[in-house]
Amino acid sequence: MARYLGPKCKLSRREGTDLFLKSGVKANDEKCKMNTAPGQHGARRARLSDYGLQLREKQKVRRMYGILEGQFKKYYVEASRRKGNTGATLLELLESRLDNVVYRMGFAATRAEARQLVVHKGIMVNGHTCNVPSAQVKAGDVVAVREKAKKQLRIQNAVELAKHRKELSWIDVNTDSLEGTMKSSPDRSELSADINEQLIIELYSK
């Protein structure tokens, strides 16, 4: 299955909420009509069944993190094997992805941009270059922008944009040296309240 390369607004409108797929330079609601589905005339949203709600929630989270179906299912399987709340563990695994951590630290304006930065070998983890977006970052790991990439305008712009986002307690970022430390596992209370991970668990556990 190929990665979606079409309009980002279309995905957000499909899910009826901002998936944070765009840089945030302009508010998404200026262009994306979240209260209507995609299409020339904005089709009315049908009332969903329980299964439909579960499926939509899964699609929303999968698209938010830019992950294909097969890989997303693997995250669920891994989360279900671990002790504790499966839904919270699933989100922890997603948030601990290297591309997401790069985005959370403010080195990229979007997760897609963060993924590209990682793939192009612009990021180091504990002093070593890592070009695997799905690599799991652990507490104590240091994530930094490589010296040769620090002058990229998109990174400088991303750092400025990140100043307007809420700071997260589980990461510590030095914007001068463009490096950050993952202090602890991601805290569910600081993640989007618009995510209902229990619906995803119900979908996969059938």
Swiss-Prot record:
Keywords: Ribonucleoprotein, Ribosomal protein, RNA-binding, rRNA-binding. Pfam families: Ribosomal_S4 (PF00163), S4 (PF01479). One of its GO terms (cellular component) is small ribosomal subunit. GO terms for biological process: ribosomal small subunit biogenesis; translation. Residues 96-158 form the S4 RNA-binding domain. GO terms for molecular function: rRNA binding; structural constituent of ribosome. HAMAP family: Ribosomal_uS4_B (MF_01306_B). Part of the 30S ribosomal subunit. Contacts protein S5. The interaction surface between S4 and S5 is involved in control of translational fidelity. One of the primary rRNA binding proteins, it binds directly to 16S rRNA where it nucleates assembly of the body of the 30S subunit. With S5 and S12 plays an important role in translational accuracy. NCBIfam families: PRK05327.1 (NF003717), rpsD_bact (TIGR01017). Belongs to the universal ribosomal protein uS4 family. This is Small ribosomal subunit protein uS4. It comes from Francisella tularensis subsp. holarctica (strain LVS). The gene is rpsD.
